[in-house]
Amino acid sequence: MKDNFYKDVEIALERIQKIIRRTPLQFSPSLSEESEAEVFLKLENYQVTGSFKARGASNKLMLLSEENPKKIITASSGNHGSAVAYAAGILNLDTLIFLP
């Protein structure tokens, strides 16, 4: 199962790498000391949309775009909606995002 998961992650990364930013890792001395392990923070706030949601939304919309959907519809109270709007714009997908 581990091997399949790792392979799926590699495939997703290859799929989305052209539309997402490669964000840095930052070593956290305080968290590392507290946990007695090396802890790094992934700075996804540097992503185009300001959160990690761009990765999952881009991957899903790229997969869906292969099926030529008429419209993508989603609901979000924040980051997911921004990520879907970003990816849909790049992929030229008709999208409706409901913000409650």
Language-model region placement:
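PLP-dependent amino-acid enzyme catalytic core
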Residues: M1-P100
